[in-house]
């Protein structure tokens, strides 16, 4: 029997952060660290996934995430197929299953899935033989975003444990927030969510976070300020009185940022709504904003995840 290539991470898929243990997260981050350094060198391309096929199956538009996964796979030498599917064409679970069966017949090695419905990636994982990576499912999880955020923080701060992190804004509709809460609390950070009452989900405190409805109090003394995009496309009803009022009370500007630690990092998963959840002055702060670095770390993290899952899949095939 062949040994698992990456024994620190033995899952066939990456469907979420919830359920992982610290050693698994650390293994993925350590592997991503190698690629982060390699990606800054002249020779970025390798052959760890030569002969492997990655299908990007996106039922929601996401140029940034899809491009990041595509670049990651190509830098590992994989063949990449991008399938952009309008969410309206997959209205029933049976149709999604039919899609899975069809793709499975093509024998891909990795399926990267983004879908508007929570649990879609997990459903596909039950129907295919390849590895499945959840690239975002509804408001549920976005595991590679949390991993790239963690890598960005660890590279700047040297650790995750013991840090105070404020996740601010539209937590209700944010899969990024949920995955980050799972990962950061797992790794020993203290997490607080900050936002207006309508945008903070009920029961969020059960995940081990503190809750603040006052932005200034929520930012006081934190090491990391993670802003979230206001997701108007997912809102039905009046969650905020106006964009102008939202920015006044919950938008990140110099005045509010001054309440965080002097060396606090500014983060945002993108795309940003400048003048809504974040002011351009702080978003572009050369010393403290790591928003562009998050994009850079996204490629490294996705290279690590793709390599680990495809490598272990190969080990399972020869077992």
From Swiss-Prot:
SUPFAM superfamilies: Aspartate/ornithine carbamoyltransferase
Entry GO terms, CC: cytosol
Pfam families membership: OTCace (PF00185), OTCace_N (PF02729)
BP GO terms, sorted: 'de novo' pyrimidine nucleobase biosynthetic process; 'de novo' UMP biosynthetic process; amino acid metabolic process
Purpose: Catalyzes the condensation of carbamoyl phosphate and aspartate to form carbamoyl aspartate and inorganic phosphate, the committed step in the de novo pyrimidine nucleotide biosynthesis pathway.
NCBIfam families: asp_carb_tr, PRK00856.1
Name used for this protein in its record: Aspartate carbamoyltransferase catalytic subunit
Lineage, opening ranks: Bacteria, Pseudomonadati, Pseudomonadota, Alphaproteobacteria, Rhodospirillales
């Amino acid at each position: 029997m062949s040994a698992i290539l990456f024994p620190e991470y033995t899952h066939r898929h990456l469907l979420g952060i919830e359920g992982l243990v610290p050693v698994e997260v650390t293994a993925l981050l350590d592997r991503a660290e190698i690629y982060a350094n390699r990606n800054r060198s002249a020779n970025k391309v390798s052959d760890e996934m030569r002969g492997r096929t990655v299908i990007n199956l996106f039922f929601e538009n996401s140029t940034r995430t899809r491009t990041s996964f595509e670049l990651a796979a190509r830098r590992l030498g994989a063949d990449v197929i991008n399938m952009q599917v309008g969410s309206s064409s997959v209205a029933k679970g049976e149709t999604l299953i039919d899609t899975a069966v069809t793709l499975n017949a093509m024998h891909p090695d990795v399926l990267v899935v983004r879908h508007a419905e929570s649990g879609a990636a997990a459903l596909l994982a039950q129907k295919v033989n390849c590895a499945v990576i959840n690239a975002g499912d509804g408001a549920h999880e976005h595991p590679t975003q949390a991993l790239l955020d963690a890598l960005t923080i660890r590279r700047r701060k040297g650790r995750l444990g013991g840090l105070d992190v404020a996740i601010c804004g539209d937590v209700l509709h944010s899969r990024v927030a949920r995955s980050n809460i799972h990962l950061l609390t797992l790794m020993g950070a203290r997490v607080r969510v900050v936002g207006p009452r309508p945008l903070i989900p009920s029961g969020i405190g059960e995940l081990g976070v503190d809750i603040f409805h006052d932005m200034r109090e929520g930012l006081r003394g934190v090491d990391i300020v993670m802003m979230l995009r206001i997701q108007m496309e997912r809102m039905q009803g009046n969650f905020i009185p106006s964009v102008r009022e939202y920015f006044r009370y919950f938008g990140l500007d110099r005045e509010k940022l001054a309440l965080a630690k002097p060396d606090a990092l500014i983060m945002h998963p993108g795309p940003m709504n400048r003048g809504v959840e974040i002011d351009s002055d702080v978003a572009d702060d050369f010393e403290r904003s790591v928003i562009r670095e998050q994009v850079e770390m996204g490629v490294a993290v996705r290279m690590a995840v793709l390599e680990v899952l495809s490598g272990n899949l190969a080990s399972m095939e020869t077992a």
